[in-house]
Curated annotation (Swiss-Prot):
Pfam annotation, one family: She2p
Native source species: Kluyveromyces lactis (strain ATCC 8585 / CBS 2359 / DSM 70799 / NBRC 1267 / NRRL Y-1140 / WM37)
Protein name as it appears in the record: SWI5-dependent HO expression protein 2
Subcellular location: Cytoplasm; Nucleus
Bilayer-crossing regions: none
Keywords per UniProt: Cytoplasm, mRNA transport, Nucleus, RNA-binding, Transport
GO molecular function, one term: RNA binding
Function text: RNA-binding protein that binds specific mRNAs including the ASH1 mRNA, coding for a repressor of the HO endonuclease. Part of the mRNA localization machinery that restricts accumulation of certain proteins to the bud and in the daughter cell.
GO biological-process terms attached to the record: mRNA transport
Lineage: Eukaryota, Fungi, Dikarya, Ascomycota, Saccharomycotina
Gene3D superfamilies recorded: She2 domain (1.20.200.20)
Subunit structure: Homodimer and homotetramer.
Gene Ontology, cellular component aspect: cytoplasm; nucleus
Amino acid sequence: MAYCQVVISKEILDAVLQLVSTYSNYISRYVDYLNNLIAVQRRVSTLRFERMTLIKYVKKLRFMADVLHSWSFEGENDLIGKRLNEVIDPLGAYLIKVFEILDLLNFYITQPMRGETISKTLNEDLVVSEETIVCINDSYRIYIKGIQWLVESISERNGNCPHLALELIEFTRKCAIEDEVDFTASEDILLQDVAIVEVEEEYVDLLHDWSAILVQKQTEMKELFSEDSKRWASMTKPVKK
């Protein structure tokens, strides 16, 4: 197996924590968004089950966002000069765990819950908008690719590390192979290979680049979340007599 020859430095640790902060903020956006939706559902008695389910997701996501927000590297000075996987592997494994839950949440709010809400209330304004669904799915793919890059840019793929396997990446590759898709010609970001970094400056620059890309996607999602939340809030305001 090929490994990145770059070792841990103070600059790398700082850049990694910046990336972690971006992921933490991303999860926090979901928490705020879901809380707004829960507030609306509280006024509709027929959506009791949907509300309880979202509350469960919110509690779990809030905990995970807090864990990422407080992520640190104990014994930082002792880590300097050691291999990158000592700090990247645990982080990658935790992010994968978080995004497996987020995958289930995305499916729930964009499909089953959406259908049930419309069926029970006959109101399409009490659900996640079509535009937001597109953004959620697109952002999720980009954030997953960021995790893949974080893990695979320091060592080539290894089937002996199931805790670092990304289901969406594996499934997309499997389907592409079955369909005889040329990976090198595909525009699907999930099929694009990740190159192992060779020098510290390159790794730090790429960490910053990924942080910038993810912040941009997060901003797009935040705007749509805000539009949905405003629409929901307007529907729950009492009518003035």
